[in-house]
Amino acid sequence: MSKKSGKGKGKNDGDELGAEKEQVLRTKVESLIQRLGHEQERADRAKAAENELRARLFDLDKDFKNEKDRLFSITSDMTRQYKQMQDELLNQVNDLNKTVIEKDEEIKKKDQQIQDMTKDYEYKLKKKDDEIQDLKRKIEEMSAEFAKMLKDTLDKMQERIEMVQWDSDTDPQMMKRLKDMTGLSNN
């Protein structure tokens, strides 16, 4: 009985054991399915987070590109304004330098004119001084000649007076003769 009952029991035990195994396996499968569901949810959440991050990264990249374009535009505009102001200032400096050169040339011309006028004035002044000296010399010569003439005339008059007899002549006649000799009778 022992063999039979052992065999019979073994079959029942094997069925029980198989049912238990099956139950354990079903539990494991259900657990694995649940776990798979959780993992799928986790993967879906990770995928959603990844998509959200990608969208955010795309927006940030778009914002970055917009900001970069805006900064480039501002930089370009500022560079253009700077170059324009630099050109304007350079033109002003060049114009002012031209004006300075022109004014320097005008000053040089005026200085030359002043020098020429000064030389001309000095030349004319020297010429006038020379004329004055010449006229003074002539006046002195004429004065000397006149003095000589007067002296000669006086000497001649004295000679004539001495020659003329004072006794025979009357005073009015003598005056007339003196006037005739000196040429004062016409006055």
Swiss-Prot record:
Cysteine pairings via disulfide bonds: none
Source domain of life: Eukaryota
Region annotated Disordered, chain positions: 1-23
Any one of the GO CC terms: cytoskeleton
Family under the similarity heading: Belongs to the DRC12 family.
Subunit structure: Component of the nexin-dynein regulatory complex (N-DRC).
Name of the protein: Dynein regulatory complex protein 12
UniProt source species: Tetrahymena thermophila (strain SB210)
Taxonomic lineage: Eukaryota, Sar, Alveolata, Ciliophora, Intramacronucleata
